[in-house]
Amino acid sequence: MEPEPEPEQEANKEEEKILSAAVRAKIERNRQRALMLRQARLACRPYPTGEGISTVKAPPKVIDSGGGFFIEEEEAEEQHVENVVRQPGPVLECDYLICEECGKDFMDSYLSNHFDLAVCDSCRDAEEKHKLITRTEAKQEYLLKDCDIDKREPVLKFILKKNPHNTHWGDMKLYLKAQVIKRSLEVWGSEEALEEAKEVRKDNRDKMKQKKFDKKVKELRRTVRSSLWKKEASGHQHEYGPEEHVEEDSYKKTCITCGYEMNYEKM
């Protein structure tokens, strides 16, 4: 009669089974990771290099420059530089981004690719929070200069889009409104300072408009007066009243309209 296994031995066997399964899973994960790293390295090699193949480079051609020295002619193959398009390697688990809105991991998204903003496509709010605005609006509404947009680090990211008003015009530059607001606060310091600057500019703009308006009114009045004076000077005809006796043979008539007096004598 065989002795029954002790409970302690059975527990050790179960632990060995669980441990072996965990080890096998870890080995499999390491193997998959090694394969992915190998694929990433291979993707960085656009052309395979064959073993045992050697190339013999011909001596460069020498050209007399006529100035007392010789120059070497570059080969056409050396002058032509091909643009090698390299496919990005696979995204590893450690390369995942964490969404600022929902906290979930994601590989890439519209906002992360174009504006370096870690927000997944599911959480993107194109109408409000992640709205895009034009460069003109960014300069007028948030009082940013070209240097604030293009020179100040980090340079604001943008996308190009066809102008909806006229396709023949240049492409529009669209910026992320949240990043524009952040840059505006960096420039002006606070929202209150920005609003004060807006009020000052508005007052100056209104003063300039009023000044231009007053100048136009003044010119218009001058033009009207000049035209009336010319009309009166060229088209007025005297309408004299009754004749008045002044002395002996002298008489006069007075214009009813302008008061001009005409003196004359009668023989």
Swiss-Prot record:
One of its GO terms (biological process) is base-excision repair. CDD domains: DBD_XPA (cd21076). Its main location: nucleus. GO terms for molecular function: damaged DNA binding; double-stranded DNA binding; zinc ion binding. Keywords: DNA damage, DNA repair, DNA-binding, Metal-binding, Nucleus, Zinc, Zinc-finger. Coiled coil: none annotated. Zn(2+) binds at residues 99, 102, 120, 123. Involved in DNA excision repair. Initiates repair by binding to damaged sites with various affinities, depending on the photoproduct and the transcriptional state of the region. This is DNA repair protein complementing XP-A cells homolog. The lineage of its organism: Eukaryota, Metazoa, Chordata, Craniata, Vertebrata. The gene is xpa.
